[in-house]
Swiss-Prot record:
Gene Ontology terms describing biological process: carbohydrate metabolic process; glucosamine catabolic process; N-acetylglucosamine catabolic process; N-acetylneuraminate catabolic process
Gene: nagB
Name listed for the protein in its UniProt record: Glucosamine-6-phosphate deaminase
UniProt entry keywords in alphabetical sequence: Carbohydrate metabolism, Hydrolase
Catalytic activity, as annotated: alpha-D-glucosamine 6-phosphate + H2O = beta-D-fructose 6-phosphate + NH4(+)
Amino acid sequence: MRLIVTKNYEEMSKVAAKEMAEDIKRNPEIVLGLATGGTPVGMYKELIRMYNEGELDFSKVTSINLDEYVGLSGDHDQSYRYFMNTNLFNHINIDKNNTFVPNGLAENVEEECMAYDSRIQDMGGIDLQLLGLGANGHIGFNEPGEALSVGTHLTDLKESTIEANARFFDSIDDVPRKAITMGLGGIMKAKKIMVIASGEGKAEVVKAMMSGKITTEIPATMLQMHRDVILIVDEDAAKLLK
């Protein structure tokens, strides 16, 4: 696991964007696994800047997102499809037909999950998977538990995750309780994984991810078993690392 510690959130975002940009330039037909949440927003802004300045071409890129809330349509302003469109896709030249997010309104969730895994397989797998870290160690919506699912699946969100995401909704009661998420198996099959984390609130989980015991109670620790992980954090998130 490679570790890069940056001064602050802004620098972390720039370093992460540069890392992804280099991979896109090396492989214009790259399959990117993308994430949502507060952490990658700065990185996406930097990628948009690079595109606007002629440094990046997304026309042949395929993207596949980690997760989506169950019960929200893609045009709901808190859905992850909406998040990706407004924070990245609408501002670059990616073909929207080559951007994939689970369908939160799927009538048959089990079929949707199986189809999502088949799609990833048909693409030849994910070349670069971007991950944020939940304060409780979740990656995607793979929450702490006795067992972790391999494939894309329906999951019940932990109370701590619901509380953390409540800031995006009018009320905590509006936060969906279920989500479709890629499983640990799909994430671990990615050829390369880039993890980004910022702020003191992520320091404990960053420490556990780097050197803690591998346990399903902290899903991020599973990344220790992957052959190519780069962890990009700011000083606050790295403060418990020796």
